[in-house]
Amino acid sequence: MSAGPGCEPCTKRPRWGAAGTSAPTASDSRSFPGRQKRVLDPKDAPVQFRVPPSSSACVSGRAGPHRGSVTSFVFKQKPITTWMDTKGPKTAESESKENNNTRTDPMMSSVQKDNFYPHKVEKLGNVPQLNLDKSPTEKSTPYLNQQQTAGVCKWHSAGERAEQLSASEPSAVTQAPKQLSNANIDQSPPTDGHSDTDHEEDRDNQQFLTPVKLANAKQTVGDGQARSNCKCSASCQCGQDCAGCQREEADVIPESPLSDVGAEDIGTGSKNDNKLTGQESGLGDSPPFEKESEPESPMDVDNSKTSCQDSEADEEASPVFDEQDDQDDRSSQTANKLSSRQAREVDGDLRKRYLTKGSEIRLHFQFEGGSNAGTSDLNAKPSGNSSSLNVDGRSSKQHGKRDSKITDHFVRIPKSEDKRKEQCEVRHQRAERKIPKYVPPNLPPDKKWLGTPIEEMRKMPRCGVRLPLLRPSASHTVTVRVDLLRAGEVPKPFPTHYKDLWDNKHVKMPCSEQNLYPVEDENGERTAGSRWELIQTALLNKFTRPQNLKDAILKYNVAYSKKWDFTALVDFWDKVLEEAEAQHLYQSILPDMVKIALCLPNICTQPIPLLKQKMNHSVTMSQEQIASLLANAFFCTFPRRNAKMKSEYSSYPDINFNRLFEGRSSRKPEKLKTLFCYFRRVTEKKPTGLVTFTRQSLEDFPEWERCDKPLTRLHVTYEGTIEGNGRGMLQVDFANRFVGGGVTGAGLVQEEIRFLINPELIVSRLFTEVLDHNECLIITGTEQYSEYTGYAETYRWARSHEDGSEKDDWQRCCTEIVAIDALHFRRYLDQFVPEKVRRELNKAYCGFLRPGVPPENLSAVATGNWGCGAFGGDARLKALIQLLAAAAAERDVVYFTFGDSELMRDIYSMHTFLTERKLNVGKVYRLLLRYYREECRDCSSPGPDTKLYPFIYHAAESSAETSDQPGQRTGT
């Protein structure tokens, strides 16, 4: 359970517009990687126009005089390993790629079908947004509106015109990638929060694409503002019909302008903060979770949003954005209805004027993409000379001075073309029927838990079956006299006298006669002596200084006298403890620890079997026996457990505490306090219970695609802890495959903390081989001896704890802990590979399954963000995997998000969605496979554009919609 070497503290990047920080200019290409301006040939752009930034019609936050205020340009932060949350790294390159991916789809539907510029214009410089009612250029620049409408009105009088129009309609999407291949497209999210610099760059691109000089560009700023409203309403009537149609075609999904860590910054100094709902601004409210550990235990507890992609998942899964999407769709549909009626009125006016003049009007207008790119549906490429756009500045001035109606410039449209146009529009609208997006229900923001009340969840011992009599068997080793087992009495060891086995199937004990040590006799000859006798001699000396303890340990570990470091132990003794505490340590606690350690052959009389891979075996021993074994581990007496590499016990965790004594980490004194609290308690009063260690190895797993079991009940909360609020439940240890992780080293995250406050767990490291993919370790009966505060670097021993857990018929505390190790993903996308998903499902299923036990006798699973944090797991995927595994094992789930309220709501919404639609385990698993195929397999960026939960919502709704139609397959 280690955060690993990659978890280093990260600093915030300066935000533009913050105090003392100025936004880079639009011309600074270094500030916008991959976004350099494209300047066309000067002859293609003889005249440039700028929209005055002080225009009152401009929308605040996009452009205008607020250059000094906080902009909405929010950069992704580096991972911050803090108390509540973990973010993953995100490079500038990946951010650029991701923005490109998210912007390409809506932009493609906005690109014109025609090549409006014959003057060698190969690329479209800047594609405007589709949100017509919020475009700042539309509100502030009347001449843009006039030019836009003129572009809409370009029609050819020939009868073949309608055929070209209908034939060219599909090209709206197919031609877009070619036009956008090298276009200077704004890569920031399409929200109300464009920065001033970004908007200036947009306007510059529009101006370079304008090869004519318009007459009304010479108007004053005041005139432009006064006329903008009336001009805009008149010019947008014809354009909105096609614009609304194309908006449905594009299926635009607006992304959030906010990052998880920037919600507070955006809210200050911006005029758009009234648009933020509580859920948007609350994405980064909960303080982040700090994750630190050593390489042995990179397992960590995540928030969630463990990574940059999570935070992105939060943005995608937020119901606020979906509501905005629906509002945009409704507004576009309304625009379609209005503009259709207005278009018919315009056509009638056109015919009257055409008959009066008696001659064909041929006008060529310059289309400018500054306000409404959606009008491209009305513009098909004309043939012959009519495609040339030879409009000079003089003709533009004349049109501007006459101030004529825009409908004066329409060419007569034949009636046959009118009918064809209407039929085409009807067909287009029918084909565009969309499946409505699922919007998760709004949940009360003040709720601390959601789902089934925790009081209704099954707990031990009330839900359990009556245990059979405790008896040893071929699959169960019992090291005490079961016939003398009494409540409140210290169990008697079995057999009565010590039995030694020195082989590769049992623990090699320090007190074994085979534990020999080279010594020199009186004649100087080297002979083999008993190492146990040397241990007894060394430890029976009095310890008044830490140096005495160091010398005693090295006396029987001579080979490591120059390798082992005791700095942490010396500093703890000399610098951390008060004089009275140090005196109590060497006068009382250490002598008692020596006594119980040297009683090992009288307490642990039976050889302890090694729990090797592929074994299904249990070991039940007394708490007193465990205390004696741990005292020997503290004094580093276990033989053959210090060598590394390909040694005999290289596939087993460390058991001797020598690594706990090294270094100057601030974690070590708190670890030593916690362990000395345990040793003081068990030496002052002998414990009377039993503890069972079970290695479970499964060969048969569900066929996940065909598993028809429904999801079980869920209680999810962002408050509390697994050990504190999951009493009587199956409590998940987010384990390292070497159980205990870095508990005897520098690790101090979820697993290590649990092993410290329940130190009897540490003895499992003595005999449990590294876990395989289909295995878990189940520990029942350990007692909690300490309370703590903090996490990782902030961990502090608080006080001694009296465990009030009930005891079962075997005199075990009703505390069941399962150690399951998750995979370590170095690439975010790897965890969605079907083989990896199946492995994690099998691992969780192995930990949750109890063969032969009825579901009504199984307690709920108390778990959390398993395999997240330093292991790179996505919290939402891991939550769904655990829900599926628990459903297959027929157990309820109590999920702790460790302070992440947004994750709590997301998990609950997903669980509610799946259960209401009666999606069983197999159907959800197939959705996970489909997500990999459609979103992850061919993804070139670090993370997919569509996050998991939004994809499941849409895919499940699409499948339900399709299944309602006869003859259609569901696609899941």
Swiss-Prot record:
Bias (Acidic residues) ranges: 311-328
Region Disordered, residue ranges: 1-239, 253-351, 369-409
Modified residues (Phosphothreonine): T137, T197
Stretch list, region Catalytic: 605-790
Active-site residues per Swiss-Prot or TrEMBL entry: D733, E751, E752
A molecular-function term among this protein's GO annotations: chromatin binding
One Gene Ontology term from the biological process aspect of the record: DNA damage response
Main location: nucleus
Polar residues bias spans: 69-84, 101-113, 128-150, 165-190, 226-238, 269-280, 332-341, 373-390
Similarity-based family: Belongs to the poly(ADP-ribose) glycohydrolase family.
Domain comment as written in the entry: The PIP-box mediates interaction with PCNA and localization to replication foci.
General function of this protein: Poly(ADP-ribose) glycohydrolase that degrades poly(ADP-ribose) by hydrolyzing the ribose-ribose bonds present in poly(ADP-ribose). PARG acts both as an endo- and exoglycosidase, releasing poly(ADP-ribose) of different length as well as ADP-ribose monomers. It is however unable to cleave the ester bond between the terminal ADP-ribose and ADP-ribosylated residues, leaving proteins that are mono-ADP-ribosylated. Poly(ADP-ribose) is synthesized after DNA damage is only present transiently and is rapidly degraded by PARG.
The protein's name: Poly(ADP-ribose) glycohydrolase
